[in-house]
Amino acid sequence: MLVLTRKIGEAVTIGDQIRIMVVEVKGNQVRLGIEAPQDMRIYREEIYLQVQEENRHAADWNLTDLENAVSLLGSGDKE
């Protein structure tokens, strides 16, 4: 992990398209400004981890779930 020291108004550039600037420091909180392409997703880490967990949960299905779904689809009356 790269650890840098920055003052208010100073920035860090990542690659050619991402710039992170220290906007404000209050007590133990640091406010960051991030300039990045609009198509790049930027999340706070706790939100990112929550989304990952929800995705894992949604992808976690079992054979019984599939059999139940097939049964429901096949239970309609056919004439």
Swiss-Prot record:
Pfam family membership, one: CsrA
Subcellular location: Cytoplasm
GO molecular function: mRNA 5'-UTR binding
The keyword Cytoplasm is annotated on this UniProt entry: yes
An example Gene Ontology CC term for this record: cytosol
Gene3D superfamilies (UniProt xref): Translational regulator CsrA
One Gene Ontology biological process: regulation of carbohydrate metabolic process
Keywords: Bacterial flagellum biogenesis, Cytoplasm, Repressor, RNA-binding, Translation regulation
Major subcellular location class: cytoplasm
SUBUNIT field: Homodimer; the beta-strands of each monomer intercalate to form a hydrophobic core, while the alpha-helices form wings that extend away from the core.
Family: Belongs to the CsrA/RsmA family.
NCBIfam families (alphabetical): csrA (TIGR00202), PRK01712.1 (NF002469)
HAMAP family: CsrA
PANTHER family noted in UniProt: CARBON STORAGE REGULATOR
Function: A translational regulator that binds mRNA to regulate translation initiation and/or mRNA stability. Usually binds in the 5'-UTR at or near the Shine-Dalgarno sequence preventing ribosome-binding, thus repressing translation. Its main target seems to be the major flagellin gene, while its function is anatagonized by FliW.
Protein name (database record): Translational regulator CsrA
Designated gene of the protein: csrA
